A protein has these predicted regions:
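Bacterial N-terminal signal peptides that target proteins for export
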Residues: 2-15
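Hydrophobic h-region of N-terminal signal peptides that target proteins for export
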Residues: 17-25
Length: 160
């Protein structure tokens, strides 16, 4: 697997991964602390913590792809998708009770993740794109669902 860094986004991706790797050497792993906080939280706060955990997994996956560890990166993308699904389920249950706490913050984070995954998909080799493209589609679809939770169905708005 080789990454192509001819594009501007590729260079920024490499710089971001290098910076993240340098910071990771200094700081302890935040994932267990985030997971514990998410397990203890409820509602919108739980969803926000879960989506931060998903973003952390996507960052780790990006680093793995840069270091040409494709299997590890694909596994981390799968974990990110699971955290995002749990966050959405939490928000969906909350919305059933008429509450929308945290939906906007989660949607913003999901948009950032989705854009980062689209950049990563452009930079990895064709044979390694499948897990990245799948994760990018998952997060794009999740964002659409979150927007639907926030604003309701656009089709129904036109009928009113």
């Amino acid at each position: 697997m080789q990454l192509t860094f001819g594009s501007r986004s590729g260079r920024w991706l490499l710089l971001g991964c290098g910076l993240s790797a340098a910071l990771a050497m200094q700081a302890p792993d935040p994932a267990p602390k985030l997971q514990a906080a998410a397990d203890a939280a409820q509602g919108g706060k739980r969803a926000e913590l879960l989506i931060h955990l998903a973003h952390l997994e996507v960052d780790r996956a990006t680093q793995a792809y840069v270091q040409q560890q494709v299997a590890q990166g694909a596994g981390q993308l799968g974990a990110a998708e699971q955290h995002a699904a749990a966050a959405y389920l939490t928000l969906q249950q909350q919305a059933a009770h008429g509450k929308k706490n945290g939906v906007r913050k989660v949607e913003i984070e999901v948009r950032k993740i989705s854009l980062g995954l689209q950049d990563l998909a452009r930079d990895v080799q064709l044979e390694d794109q499948s897990p990245v493209a799948h994760a990018a589609k998952t997060f794009t679809d999740l964002r659409d669902h979150l927007l639907s939770l926030l604003f309701g169905d656009a089709e129904n708005k036109g009928a009113k």
